[in-house]
């Protein structure tokens, strides 16, 4: 599932979903592209088995980097799965990573930009970083409402704000 649905700006209650999925044998995999870097997603506490993110959106960089984090339960599935791999194989990538390498060309400028972003977040402190994102989201929502606009989502995310156009809007 998604932590935040981009087109609607909706925040999903991943913590509650994680509790439900944890009572089954299913893996709980979360698309965190719009969430990671924008608000807390504690994998262990929320019973998340796999968290996938990218450098765009929540991490505040251009597209080009992917991040994957797995629980031990998820890694066990990855390492024992018998399904064929056609392009990307996490087992091969893990082996390369253990040797300090990657299977594909590393976009060095994006890695350096990531270092800059992470250093800045570390300087500020994670709680303060998330607080600042919440402050900006609250301000954006406040200003939209002050302009007579309404939010699209009843459960808005702090990472993206979707605003409904007025019914009489003409254009685009």
What spans do the regions from the language model cover?
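Fold-independent oxyanion-binding glycine-rich loops
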Residues: 2-5, 30-33, 39, 54-56, ...
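Active-site phosphate-binding strand-loop segment of PLP-dependent enzymes
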Residues: 1-33, 50
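Conserved active-site segment immediately N-terminal to the catalytic lysine
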Residues: 44-56
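Short, well-ordered, mixed-charge alpha-helical segments that flank or form enzyme active sites
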Residues: 6-11, 36-40, 45, 59-62, ...
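Conserved PLP-binding catalytic core of the aspartate aminotransferase-like
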Residues: 150-172
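Active-site C-terminal subdomain of aminotransferase-like
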Residues: 56-142
């Amino acid at each position: 599932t998604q932590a935040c649905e981009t087109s609607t700006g909706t925040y999903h209650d991943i913590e509650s979903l994680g509790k439900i999925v944890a009572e089954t044998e299913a893996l709980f995999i979360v698309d965190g592209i719009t969430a990671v870097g924008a608000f807390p997603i504690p994998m262990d506490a929320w019973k998340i088995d796999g968290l996938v993110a990218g450098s765009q959106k929540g991490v505040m960089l251009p597209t080009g980097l992917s991040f994957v984090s797995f629980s031990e339960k998820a890694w066990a599935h990855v390492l024992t799965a018998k399904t064929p791999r056609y392009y990307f194989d996490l087992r091969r990538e893990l082996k390369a990573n253990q040797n300090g390498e990657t299977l594909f060309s590393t976009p060095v400028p994006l890695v350096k930009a990531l270092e800059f972003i992470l250093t800045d977040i570390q300087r500020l402190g994670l709680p303060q970083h998330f607080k600042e994102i919440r402050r900006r989201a609250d301000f954006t929502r406040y200003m939209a409402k002050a302009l007579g606009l309404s939010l699209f989502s009843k459960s808005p995310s702090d990472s993206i704000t979707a605003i409904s156009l007025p019914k009489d809007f003409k254009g685009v």
